[in-house]
Amino acid sequence: MSFHSDLITSLGIKVTRLVTDSRAVTPGDTFIAYPGSKADGRQFIKQAITNGANAVIWEALGFSWNKTWQLPNLAVADLRHNAGEIADHVYGSPSQKMWVIGITGTNGKTSSCHWIAQSFCALGKKTALIGTLGNGFHSTLQPTLNTTPDAIRLHELLADYLTQGAQAVAMEVSSHALEQGRVNGVQFDVALLTNLSRDHLDYHGDMPSYAAAKRRLFDWQQLKYAVLNLDDSFGAEIAEQLQDKGVEVVGYGLNDAALALAERLGLRMVYGSALRMDTHGFSLQIHSSWGGGELHNTLIGRFNVVNLLGVMAVLLVSGVTLSNALHELSLVSAVPGRMQTFGNGDRPTVVVDYAHTPDALEKVLQAVREVVRREIVGIHDGKVICVFGCGGDRDRGKRPMMGAIAAKLADVSIITSDNPRSEAPLDIIAAIVSGITSGRKATNGTYQIIEDRASAIAQAVLSAHATDIVLIAGKGHESYQEVRGVKYPFSDAEVAQRALLAWRDEAQA
């Protein structure tokens, strides 16, 4: 840290605020300029100076300072990855003054992040959260473009939350953020792994590279606790590798193999047994190194149960008592767009979920399949109806995989448009359908193609019986549909609720 602080001191000016967007520079700001994925910040140095920048810190590789820019400046090699430590220094190392939990994994990050923050706040520990649904405090989240902000903005946010009285921060940490150094300079106290499955291969290229990016969080300097899902093979692998590395590994899971691994490695553990689930929620026996108890919640889905075990482990290593953890986790509810349920009772159950990977779609379909209502003989048995598509300009290899999964686990699949972006929706749909029609013997469900997403959702709900579950997967909380560079207003939840009203009107007619 002294290396960067000495360099900043050498500028001869007071650095109080760092900015990476030249358009956002105001008099007295220091401009940080490095190449990004879409533009090179160094091309906007002149604009930053015009807007009142008091100095410029710039990426040294492949660039020369224009001597007509008579302004204090500093060339730094690999600035993008050093920016976090520079920002940490400028903003007074805010993460060192709070309890910081980083959550990574393919699925479950958002729910886990929110449940940790909700539980801490309810217990009197003011907690900020940073993630997909926004940044800030739970009741006043500000929208965000990325799951994890860039390094400069991240440290500014941490400093702001500290000023507002935050004692803790729960933060989603994406693989992109770890790869690009967006969380560099942050002092993490606890790192939580939810799971690892196929995603973002359009960016990382292959699963080993994707896993390596996630793995970085568990090698973090001065990390105190690594909380790992031992039901997940990647979590079990990390647990083995972290032995005698100076960080305490804490496991969690539902499987006997997870418990056996924890016992063999001598780990503290949170383990669940005797799981019972229906459309109204679940009950679970808790066994842990902190004691035992019973957990009830209205959430549905085995994967949500596992996520709650991970959150419980985080709370326990953070000093929360088991009784308080059980109480608070019995009260948490579905995060918007994450197994969010509507209807039920005398209407079909509609579940809106962000599942956009093969593993996530499989897990949510298994979850609703486990709790779909089976009625007495002579009354309609519940079916699972799945509405989904795949995003354009993303990993194309997962499309047929998701089609095959839906065909296997749903009684009816309605293939529709997601966020097609620059691709033709019907081309994406055709790739999904290829997985349904590829001759797999396990394919039992029927399928339809309805390109318009609103029409697909309406058809699914209106055709459902009261005992059916309609799963609308892929977009979750998103309030738009992106087509050819334009984001049109669209909400799966709103469309589903309108369809449920129409279903009720038809049923009463």
Task: Mark where each language-model region is.
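Active-site beta-alpha connecting loops in nucleotide-dependent enzymes
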Residues: 36-39, 335-337, 367-439, 453, ...
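Acidic, Mg2+-coordinating active-site environments of NTP-dependent enzymes
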Residues: 62-67, 179, 190-350, 435, ...
